[in-house]
Amino acid sequence: MTVTKTAAYETLTESSAAALAVRLGLFPSKSTLTCREIGDGNLNLVFRVYDKEQQRGLVIKQAVPYAKVVGESWPLTLDRARIESSALIRQAEHVPHLVPKVYYSDTELAVTVLEDLSHLEIARNGLIDGKDYPHLSEDIGEFLGKTHFYSSEYALDPTVKERLVKQFTNPDLCDITESLVFTDPFFDHETNDFEEELRDEAEVLWGNEALKIEAAKLKQRFLSAEETLIHGDLHTGSIFAGEDGETKIIDPEFAFFGPIGFDIGQFIANLLLNALSREENRRAPLYRHVETVWNTFSRTFSEAWENDAVETCKHENGRLESVLRQAFEDAAGFAGCEMIRRTIGLAHVADLDTIVPFSRRISQKKLALKIGAAFIEKRSGFRTPKDMIEAFRNALKE
């Protein structure tokens, strides 16, 4: 695709980001500000602007017209900034305590100005350091239960949902997910990235036609099931957390109307990838998170259904159970795709890539591929999170 920048668009620098904050009236004109680029993501520029005298800061996030992880050879739409700010505002209608405040957004500059969350840390980093965040999965379950229900056909008038589907149409970023999660890792594709010691396992996976058919079915669900407004990229790097129990979900630029089970599947996959990086005696908190996130999501979604479902749904016996059953099966399959993608595809996770020694890193990555394939192929047999955990632990013993 070709990205067209508007006449107003210019890439921010540390000095121009600070000037923008003053121009918007977010700091007094005579403030002495410091501004530092803090982004380490694949797609955007992120600046923290701070007034030491007032001890107050904010974050300015700007989309750039290409994928930073690849370079200008991979152009991307700037409209993802609008998607992100709109998603955060909608999520805040239901879980304001779990998302950052949006102070300002500008579609021409592709800028979103956000609450400063520097008192928290990225959950992935904390989990790698051995922190457990006991409230993390309960918060994510509540976030998903409420945001997924209240943006679904079970809560919305059909015309409202149709309008939202159009508002959050996000073809470029959906194409990234389709390629990097559901397609490329299952073939010998140039975007794949892995150690040569994993080639034998990768080639076995590429030759598994039954697995590839199941992955294609999951891709079809991802592309066609316009069930609710999903976050679209809910891994542990998209979550800020604090040991005092505070949680904030960030970066919903991949948001669009997709299957209910996708977000929870991605979150579970990243929990289990972290579990692979730990010794067995340190994995119990991750197993608890897997159970808690599903149980909290299911309970929250069910309570919202009982209170606020449209009348037609309330009179359909078994409909809620069917929706949750499909979401759980999908979540298991999507988790499997995510585990495989994060092991041999583009954009790895530090949970695996920082394992030492190298020999253990390779052995754990081989397990990630094996577990991912099992989750995809056996997803219809999973009934509870305990089934996922049992499959995970059994793979470790084999």
Swiss-Prot record:
Name the reaction it catalyses: 5-(methylsulfanyl)-D-ribose + ATP = 5-(methylsulfanyl)-alpha-D-ribose 1-phosphate + ADP + H(+)
Provide the E.C. number(s) assigned to this enzyme.
2.7.1.100
Specify the taxonomic lineage. Bacteria, Bacillati, Bacillota, Bacilli, Bacillales
Any single Pfam family the record assigns to this protein: APH
Keywords annotated in UniProt: Amino-acid biosynthesis, ATP-binding, Kinase, Methionine biosynthesis, Nucleotide-binding, Transferase
Q: Locate the residues binding ATP.
A: 44, 61, 115-117, 251-253
Per UniProt, what is one GO molecular function of this protein?
Answer: S-methyl-5-thioribose kinase activity
Q: Which family does it belong to?
A: Belongs to the methylthioribose kinase family.
Tell me the protein's name. Methylthioribose kinase
Q: How does it assemble?
A: Homodimer.
The pathway is: Amino-acid biosynthesis; L-methionine biosynthesis via salvage pathway; S-methyl-5-thio-alpha-D-ribose 1-phosphate from S-methyl-5'-thioadenosine (hydrolase route): step 2/2
